[in-house]
Regions:
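Core catalytic lobe of class I
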Residues: 1-170
């Protein structure tokens, strides 16, 4: 069985070279907000306000929705982030994943759940672990963002069905 695969490099906010409803699966991991300079002009996230960061990501989700075939999937790997006190006057967790879910649902992508990707082990295998700090002051616990989400979305409509030959070859 012969298949064709094309790699197109460009800005995901404007995927003009990719026809409407021509992609069957999108897997993406957007740039982190304010954490990494990727060294490209007009990059998303670095030196952006949070609002601009989310607006740029929303342009990406709109383009993903346009190129995604009906009934097919978008998978987004994203982690929430601590906001520095410079931005909010205090430290807090910014739930970026919830912004993505809200926008994608608004443009017609159904949220199908998430996979939690535990990036490091936090299990104390020696048996002496503590939860939320240590006795007698557990209220001073440290929250670690050592996981990311893999958000799963499905575009409304009927997905293309594999042929008998495709099934047999798989």
């Amino acid at each position: 069985m012969k298949t064709t695969h094309t790699i197109t490099q460009g800005d995901s906010r404007q995927m003009n070279l990719i026809p409407d409803r021509s992609v069957h699966l999108i897997i993406t991991s957007p740039p982190y907000w304010q954490l990494k300079d990727y060294g490209t002009e007009h990059q998303i996230g670095f030196n952006d306000s949070y609002e601009n960061y989310i607006n740029h990501l929303n342009l990406v989700w709109s383009e993903c929705n346009r190129v995604l075939h009906d009934g097919c999937r978008l998978c987004v790997n994203i982690g929430d982030q601590f906001a520095r006190s410079v931005y909010y006057g205090r430290y807090k967790v910014i739930p970026i994943h919830s912004e993505i879910i809200k926008f994608c649902e608004a443009i017609g992508l159904d949220f199908m759940g998430q996979i939690i990707w535990q990036k490091t082990t936090t299990m104390n295998t020696s048996g002496g672990g503590t939860v939320m700090g240590s006795f007698p002051h557990p209220r001073n616990g440290i929250v670690k963002l050592d996981f990311e989400y893999i958000l799963l979305f499905k575009k409304q409509g009927k997905a293309p069905q594999p042929t008998k030959n495709h099934k047999k070859a798989a």
